């Protein structure tokens, strides 16, 4: 892992308001445990192995319960893989960091770069006007790959109180093609990276891999029920 210079960004007022709202929601011990990572576990493990990943950052990890001895508390039933050990042990990686600006235990901004950054069920929680700088920040922490998972549908949760009471917590809803184009756009500053973008569909987990070609262009490889390599 190498040192990382923190970029100068000015979050929108809405971003700061929503972070405060998520902090309040985190007081419920059942909220944002990090379970969205569970169905993606073995997809990510395969990608890590293929790209020889030795270190990673989970950006927007929530409570990060899957990384603790209490990982089983986040296992929500048979539709998910049956985890036998904390997720970093499943990946076989000891060098990792957790970051979530709305959870005090993981709120310290990362200061290093990692082989990989993963961010699952995060970007749809970010106001649309802040997506460019948040994604640029995610990309900037990676030296090899970025793995993103997004949802294009409304969440079950709404904000329970405050200015945004009743608003769905998925504040940025876009179709899959929009996200692919957005990933391409942000990658223009990070052309050395492979970007793995996945989302849920009726066929399972569908994904695309955005990577550079020898002629300097980019391409997207798509696959269903797994992520392209």
Locate predicted features:
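Short glycine-centered segments of the SAM/dcSAM-binding site in methyltransferase folds
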Residues: 144-147
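A conserved beta-strand element that flanks and buttresses the S-adenosyl-L-methionine
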Residues: 118
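Short N-terminal helix/helix-N-cap motif within the alpha/beta-hydrolase-1
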Residues: 127-131
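Hydrophobic adenine-recognition pocket in adenosine-nucleotide-binding enzymes
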Residues: 122-125
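Conserved N-terminal segment of class I S-adenosyl-L-methionine
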Residues: 1-114, 132-135, 141, 152-156, ...
């Amino acid at each position: 892992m190498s040192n990382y210079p923190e970029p100068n960004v000015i979050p929108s007022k809405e971003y700061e308001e929503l972070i405060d709202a998520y902090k309040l929601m985190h007081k419920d011990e059942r909220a944002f445990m990090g379970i969205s990572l569970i169905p993606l576990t073995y997809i990510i493990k395969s990608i890590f192995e293929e790209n020889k990943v030795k270190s990673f950052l989970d950006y927007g990890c929530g409570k990060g319960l899957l990384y603790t001895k209490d990982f089983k508390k986040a296992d929500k039933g048979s539709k998910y893989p049956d985890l036998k050990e904390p997720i970093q042990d499943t990946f076989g990686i000891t060098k990792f960091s957790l970051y979530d600006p709305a959870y005090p235990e993981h709120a310290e901004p990362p200061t290093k770069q990692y082989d990989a950054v993963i961010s699952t069920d995060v970007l749809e929680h970010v106001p649309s006007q802040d997506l460019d700088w948040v994604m640029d920040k995610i990309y900037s922490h990676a030296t090899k790959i970025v793995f993103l998972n997004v949802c294009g549908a409304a969440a079950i949760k709404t904000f329970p109180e405050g200015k945004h009471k009743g608003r769905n917590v998925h504040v940025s809803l876009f179709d899959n093609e929009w996200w692919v184009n957005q990933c391409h756009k942000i990658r223009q500053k990070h052309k050395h990276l492979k970007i793995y973008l996945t989302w849920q569909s009726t066929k399972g987990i569908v994904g695309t891999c955005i990577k550079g070609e020898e002629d300097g262009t980019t391409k997207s490889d798509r696959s269903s029920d797994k992520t392209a390599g």
